Amino acid sequence: TITQNTYLMRNLKELRIAVAGTGYVGLSIATLLSQRHKVTAVDVIADKVDRINRRESPIQDEYIERFLREKPLDLTATLDGEAAYRDADFVVIAAPTNYDPKKNFFDTSHVEEVIDLVLKVNPDAVMVIKSTVPVGYTASVRERFSYRERLADGTMKVVVPNIIFAPEFLRESKALYDNLYPSRIIVGYDRGDSALEEAAGTFAALIKEGSLKEDVPVLFMGSTEAEAVKLFANTYLALRVSYFNELDTYAEMKGLDTRSIIDGVCLDPRIGSHYNNPSFGYGGAALELGDVVDHL
């Protein structure tokens, strides 16, 4: 439960934000939010922390590199997650969740390590999972990390952690650009929790505040539906890449002009001319097609 001493009683401009992870997802959201808010980025790799504090990007992203170099960002990086989370209103979790072929599941252990530490040092903080996770994960992890607390009158109360889910729709090397010009903002939360509803609205406002695009569509839904949106979007993009690669393979085998076929197919407005250039196959930590389908 969110107490009266947290961000709900503060002006939007006074928020303190911690970001766990400084990969494409974490560093892009940290850069975006630090335009207007105090942001502390947490990582376990000292070299990445040092480079961020020197205003050098540890990842290849033109916009992140330029913003770190030229913008007056209120951004610091640290190895000390406990200190970063202790005073945070929001903790954005962008820890890696790569697919584990041995377990046949996403490895969410790093996400849970962050949740566990936040609950120890700042249980009132709102945690926002941006890592790719299985459908139903946010609801299950909230239940798993629930705990009993004794009230002043001696009665026991079940406390459910403040965790919401906000999927990312980013391209590597263009992560900050995609945050500055988002196609949509989606935030999922427990629809029966009015405090989390307000937290979801505040987080969406933070993202919208940092973006440069006007009239960004904002969708609120259950956390499980938001998780499904992320995985189904990934699945469609993977299918589309595979489709045009197969078209190209067929055309090459038959001695046909691939571009003519693609142009003719894609002029249908139901198909469109985006993501239609045959090349290498799809890839990325969150774009493992067979693995994604297994968890839908």
List each model region and its residues.
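Structural/interface elements that position substrates and couple domains in central-metabolism enzymes
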Residues: T3-L296
